[in-house]
């Protein structure tokens, strides 16, 4: 959102006054006529997320905006991905153009307890992590399928990236740069 580099000892998001000094691309898009919204289906007060979101986006969707089955299946970090992506799709389908919506999915975060059948069996952390990644990937895939079927895909740029690397894969040493490689995928009909 604001190109703040990763710092090994300090989470910069906890210092809103520092973030305010940085450029924030959602504000630039707002000035260009875009509507902006942030989706964080968890506790928006965690880690000072609320201050970053409110100073950067016109609106937000948090776990407070979910009910029923989504909240009944809530986990440590908030609402699972399938519910967040369903809400995101519903909102995009009726959004005024142009828009920039950013969504933070959380089911791929520990403790890696995801709903549905286990696709990658195993009780150790690595297998639970891989199963959670499989679940999140399936939720993203369903979201993209809906966007393609409805035509939203045709004139939209989708950017997928991770918020951090992982220490949960056995063969990745957390002290090496490989542990911090994160994907950045640009896709969609707008390309």
Predicted regions and their residues:
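Solvent-exposed soluble domains appended to multi-pass membrane proteins
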Residues: 1-191
């Amino acid at each position: 959102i604001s190109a703040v580099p990763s710092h090994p000892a300090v989470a910069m998001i906890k210092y809103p006054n520092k973030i305010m000094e940085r450029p924030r691309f959602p504000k630039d898009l707002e000035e260009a006529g875009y509507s902006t919204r942030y989706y964080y289906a968890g506790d928006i007060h965690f880690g000072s997320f609320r201050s970053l979101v409110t100073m950067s986006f016109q609106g937000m969707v948090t776990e407070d905006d979910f009910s029923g089955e989504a909240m009944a299946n809530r986990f440590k970090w908030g609402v699972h991905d399938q519910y967040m992506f369903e809400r995101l799709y519903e909102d995009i389908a009726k959004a005024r153009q142009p828009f920039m919506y950013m969504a933070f999915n959380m089911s791929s975060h520990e403790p890696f307890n995801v709903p549905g059948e286990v696709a990658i069996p195993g009780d150790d952390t690595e297998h639970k992590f891989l199963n959670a990644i499989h679940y999140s990937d399936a939720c993203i895939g369903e979201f993209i399928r809906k966007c393609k079927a409805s035509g939203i895909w045709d004139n939209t740029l989708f950017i997928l990236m991770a918020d951090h690397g992982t220490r949960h894969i056995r063969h990745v040493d957390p002290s090496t740069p490989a542990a911090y490689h994160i994907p950045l995928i640009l896709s969609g009909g707008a390309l």
